[in-house]
């Protein structure tokens, strides 16, 4: 029997999730939608021909008797409110990042979920579902390259919009690395420093770009992440793990190799959605399957909280230039 989903937020990512849950994935049916712009929500229902009911707001949708699980895809500052409401209603909830806009807000969600007595929250970190990252983690976990000593990573975007500010390199961009690298290493961060190289002429006047974020983990692994959001040439994600006896590198997306006009070339993707489109499908299918089976295994509220704590420290390091400690308490046994 199909899991009946309610989707809060019908912007770009909300529409994508409605489409995949209705047309691509198995075991789910979108029966309810809402958006701050109700006309937009109704338009999405018509265009996708899904027959879902449009609710006045997120709280009405969560309370609807036929909604069995909730997808929160709305504006970031609204996430905490809706996730807490879903937990209070006893309904599983998939929340796009951020889980909340502050670490304190994420902590409220963790506490509410623990009080409920069961896992109800999955956070929309999609990279652990990417085939390349999974293959990289398999090599690390096998011990084939020994213990990880260093990671060299990069997160490059061709360009960003006028509203993008320097701290968003952490909260909107690096946040994915903060989650996936912690997952890759099964290790928590203990400190961070951020430095700014020479500024690119392609960056807007109000922002600093690129940035280099240097992290240290509890076991002493050193990580450097280049964040360059005006690189011009494409959307490019890199991750190289230097171990005691070898090096493992995140594979490039599969592209046709072209021999033409005296050149050997491979195309570089320009859009993050194209780079991780398959991971989005696997991620949401995992949520649907988990809810239908009675157990959610995906990125947890604690993972969302850990990423938020690290992000807060990174922003502090941006502003100070100093090495900033990252203080994360021990993970509750509830999330083991």
From Swiss-Prot:
What is this enzyme's EC?
1.1.1.18
Tell me which domain of life the UniProt entry assigns to the organism this sequence originates from. Bacteria
Alphabetically sorted, this entry's keywords are: NAD, Oxidoreductase
Against Gene3D superfamilies, the record matches this protein to: Dihydrodipicolinate Reductase, domain 2, NAD(P)-binding Rossmann-like Domain
- Please give one Gene Ontology molecular function term for this protein: inositol 2-dehydrogenase (NAD+) activity
Under catalytic activity, the entry for this protein gives: myo-inositol + NAD(+) = scyllo-inosose + NADH + H(+)
Check the record and name the SUPFAM superfamilies matching this protein. Answer: Glyceraldehyde-3-phosphate dehydrogenase-like, C-terminal domain, NAD(P)-binding Rossmann-fold domains
Q: Which HAMAP family match?
A: IolG
Which PANTHER family does its entry note?
A: INOSITOL 2-DEHYDROGENASE (PTHR43593:SF1), PTHR43593
Purpose of the protein: Involved in the oxidation of myo-inositol (MI) to 2-keto-myo-inositol (2KMI or 2-inosose).
The family annotation for this protein states: Belongs to the Gfo/Idh/MocA family.
Protein name, UniProt field: Inositol 2-dehydrogenase
Q: Which organism is it from?
A: Pseudomonas savastanoi pv. phaseolicola (strain 1448A / Race 6)
| Top-level taxonomy | Bacteria, Pseudomonadati, Pseudomonadota, Gammaproteobacteria, Pseudomonadales
